[in-house]
A protein has these predicted regions:
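Short Gly/Ser/Thr- and Asp/Glu-enriched loop/turn motifs at secondary-structure junctions
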Residues: 147-152
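Short, hydrophobic/π-rich interface segment
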Residues: 103-142, 146, 159
Length: 160
């Protein structure tokens, strides 16, 4: 795992995954979109890129729990069916083609009240330093990593 970000990676909520897979509804109650992977789509539930031909679900998701100005919804890809893959929740692979985060991505720091404190657009080789700097702030409760081109939520990082 070249340039892996070391932090505790939060799982996407099981109730969200169950809802999109069994009911076909996303976090906003909208019908999800089923797609066949072209290959390379970021699969949020398994923290890897999709393989060509895999069945995926595209659904609206919010990584926030509290109401407020930063509570937003956005698209995420998840595998259409439950996976038995083992997922490393202690690091996120970044940097090389095929890795979940690949190249440049955004990291945002949030308070306990889910208000944004800081943000940075980083290359994989600077990611760990940015994560460490954001977590050095005592008011940082968690971080979000996002794909900058489409703005999609990649993952939530908590203190190890």
């Amino acid at each position: 795992m070249n340039n892996a970000i070391r932090a505790r990676v939060a799982e996407i909520p099981a109730d969200f995954l169950k809802q999109v897979r069994t009911e076909g509804r996303d976090a906003l109650g909208q019908q999800v979109k089923r797609v066949i992977a072209e290959g390379g789509e970021p699969c949020r539930d398994v923290l890897r890129r999709a393989n060509k031909g895999e069945e995926l679900t595209l659904a609206s998701f919010s990584p926030f729990q509290k109401p407020g100005p930063y509570h937003e919804y956005g698209p995420v890809f998840v595998l259409a069916n439950e996976s038995t893959e083992t997922i490393d929740r202690t690091a996120v692979p970044a940097g090389e083609d095929g890795n979940y985060l690949q190249q440049r991505f955004a990291i945002r720091a949030y308070s306990e009240n889910e208000e944004i404190l800081d943000a940075a657009l980083v290359e994989p080789d600077a990611a760990q330093e940015t994560v460490d700097r954001f977590f050095a702030r005592t008011d940082t409760a968690f971080l979000h990593v996002r794909f900058p081109s489409y703005g999609c939520f990649a993952c939530r990082l908590d203190r190890s």
